[in-house]
């Protein structure tokens, strides 16, 4: 697709054949909605809910029971593609942004628009398929430009960052630049590398680079780089042995 950002988050991705929209008003109502989908045969178990964000519990082997008993333990984000330009698969700045974005959502007033999940799915597929281009998204039944809506949220996140003293303004600036210039997106950069080197060669070159970097740093203990190398090795082994 011309201008695609993420094939996996578009029609080519792993998803439910029929769109499923659980209830998120409360943990209890969320559980009840999943149980209803299972009883109706829409899905066979909670594991077959392939939404972009899933509520996870203390005991995910018995998810629904544990959610009811223990509440939400953490959120599983399933829409984040692997970043091939970072050897960890995701950059630290992107993680900081996700952290800030979660805080922003906690403070953001909810809309009472009832079709928000349907709109979100349409927006997701539009961004995934044509996200490098300027396009219109749906927001509470109205059309809004992608960049306008994105900048609005980033400005609100900037205010939250300043209010809470989080010192993440650099992260927000990175996202603002990426929103304004599609050539800064990972998708565009990957396509350009593949054009120059070929798909297989590009991936192998990155893999070899990360292997070499890991090998050169095999004795380094992160966070203690200012110590003697022998001390770092000793501390590293101690941690491995649980000391």
Feature annotation, model-predicted:
Residues 1-69, 116, 135-139:
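Loop-rich catalytic cores of soluble enzymes, especially ATP-dependent carboxylate-amine ligases
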Residues 72-74:
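Extracellular structured ligand-interaction cores
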Residues 102-133:
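Flexible helix-coil linker/hinge segments at domain or subdomain boundaries
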Residues 116, 127-243:
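Sequence termini and other peripheral, non-core segments
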């Amino acid at each position: 697709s011309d201008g695609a950002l993420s094939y996996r988050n578009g029609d080519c991705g792993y998803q439910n054949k029929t769109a499923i929209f659980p209830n998120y008003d409360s943990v209890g109502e969320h559980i009840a909605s999943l149980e209803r989908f299972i009883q109706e045969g829409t899905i066979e178990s909670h594991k077959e809910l392939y939404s972009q964000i899933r509520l996870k519990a203390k005991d995910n082997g018995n998810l629904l029971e544990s959610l009811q008993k223990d509440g939400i333990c953490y959120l599983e984000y399933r829409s984040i593609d692997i970043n091939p330009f970072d050897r960890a698969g995701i950059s630290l700045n992107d993680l900081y942004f996700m952290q800030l974005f979660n805080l922003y959502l906690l403070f953001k007033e909810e809309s009472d628009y009832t079709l928000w999940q349907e709109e979100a799915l349409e927006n997701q597929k539009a961004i995934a398929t044509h996200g490098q281009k300027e396009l219109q998204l749906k927001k509470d039944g109205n059309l809004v430009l992608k960049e306008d809506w994105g900048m609005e949220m980033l400005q609100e996140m900037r205010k939250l960052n300043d209010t809470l003293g989080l010192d993440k303004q650099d992260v927000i600036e990175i996202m603002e630049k990426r929103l304004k210039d599609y050539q800064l997106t990972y998708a565009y950069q990957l396509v350009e590398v593949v054009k120059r080197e070929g798909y297989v060669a590009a991936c192998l070159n990155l893999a070899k680079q990360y292997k070499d970097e890991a090998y050169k740093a095999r004795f380094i203990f992160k966070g203690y780089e200012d110590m003697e190398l022998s001390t770092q090795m000793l501390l590293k082994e101690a941690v491995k042995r649980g000391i």
